[in-house]
Amino acid sequence: MKILNKAFIGCLLAAGFTMTSCDYLDVIPAETTTGTDMTKDRQAALNYLYSCYGYLPTPNAGPTSLDFLTGDEVVTAFEHETFAAFPKGNYSASSPVISYWNTLYQGIRQCYMFQDELNKTGNFHGLAEKDREDYKAQVTFLIGYYHFLLSRCYGPIILVHQTPDPMLLPSDYQGQEPYDDCVNFICEKFDEAAKGLPATRTGSQANEFGLATSVAAKAMKAKMLLYAASPLFNGNSKFYSDFKDKEGKTLMPLTYDESKWSKAAAAFKDAITAAEAAGYHLYDRGDCKIKYNGYPADPHVRALRYTITDYSAEDEQAGANSEVIWADSRGEGYYGIQNKSEPYIYGGDGAWNGVAPTIAMLSRFYTKNGLPIDEDKTFDYANRWDPVEVDEAHKDEAYPGRKTQKFNLDREPRYYAWVAFQDGYYEILSASNNGAYSSDENYTLTSDNTHGRLICDFVLGGNCSRGVDANSKRTSNYSPTGFLNKKFVNPDLAKSKSGWEYTNNPWPLIRLAELYLGYAECLAETGDLTNARLYLDKVRTRAGLPGVKEAYEQFGKDPSKATTKEGLRDIIRNERMNEFYLENQNFWDMRRWLLAEKYFNVKVKGLNIDAENINDFSEVQEVVFERKFQSPMNYLMPIPSADINRNDHVVQTPGY
């Protein structure tokens, strides 16, 4: 597997001279980016460009990612880390914990400064004109994207139209602009960028994978408009009727506007057309050509497991992925999601067994018939936690002859691709020398090292449990719910007891499935249910599920649910939660749908991980970790108090 990107490696190195301690509201230029050495030649231009990307938040840095492990999808054994302040509700204006406010405005300033230098004749000797125009378009994209990230956090924001004037008086500092004006500005930036960017970066540009494209610009415009149409931002007078600037101007739209859904739908259709014309398609069974681990064997499960880990150099786009439109190709590092998710290595290190899906999330995944477990009339929901012996008919789901809960059987392929459960499988290779799992009697490794998987046992004393017995329970590196995450862990990884092995897969920021489901959501809200189901079913089909209308008519307790606006809305939302599990969506989607208070303000539930037998283990219990969400305050992020104090024109987010 070819791991990219050299561009982002350079980006991180180049960013070192730009991440200064001053903030945007101080309007102080970064002195270290001035001087002829920064504008002398083509390499200087490339370094400057990469420095502009250096302000992208790291989406998969577990300890410090705002939206990664902070929804209700998982609970972890790492609640001492910085991110845990958010699900616990322990953040405020005086202590925002993780804040984008200053960093992203620094990034915006850096982009405008680079644009200014690109527009000066004589700068960057040897830089071809086509590259100069491409760089201009890329930083225009980043200006739009950084404003988008800010608006997602804070709603109405300060709009930056040009390089800030270092001589600006505090009395002339800007305040926030009305939210709809912010949306228009961001969309204009994406439109402008799309005109100057290539649709893909392939062939000789393969080392540029991760840089902006016109398809990414169109996709991000659609995403911005989706947020603008959503309940949090569209006519939410209950929360924001008093959200006004210092002059009394209303900052949030207080009247619902259904046409915003139509506008977003048009943008999604434009992005989909551009993406498909550029060759993007949903990663499916025919794309899964990796020749290493033979597990998972089921073709649907296998394709889903590799959907966001296969960036094989065998692809037509070297190092690319047929579905991922834009990715962050910085590596996650030793303390990333892979090592934190992998089954525990007794007598070793680097596999910490600690990213645990919650029962709330696990219950969202469908049955094999493509319905929620409480809506499928063929699923024994009332007795779902009963332990049963696995028979040969379910051998691809769990190990025959051993026991698991009914809850884990007859589920959809995504469940088996991304979740490990009692006596189910964790597909991972064990290194030929000093192998991580080779000595475990529950591990299968063929003689040619091509098929490797672990049978997971979470009952106390088992290989994935909290400890070997009741007297040696670990206080870290354990699953708090009795389940483990498999998403983003490459089955081809050959793990040794030293635990240093992990793959630096690019991280999807937006992929084609998100365009299909975003379009379906917008169409459903405008009443076009037929086409909404059409695009919803594209994602369901790839997941190995029947069409939504067929599934409900044949297996649903409410056979007509997929034919009503309210029913289809609920179905599409659930589909997003399943498809984008652990992809930085849950934290924001629950907010924009105004559902965060319902789902983020409840105790996490899991199985009895202190049990010493399967019957006791099958009891559902509350996990000890605190969860708190205060409405309406926590729907948006707080602006740091220090910045409010520096700029008298900025008003604080309501509630903080």
Region roles according to the model:
Residues 22-70, 406-409, 640-656:
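Membrane-proximal, proline-rich intrinsically disordered regions
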Residues 98, 393-542:
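C-terminal substrate/ligand-recognition segments
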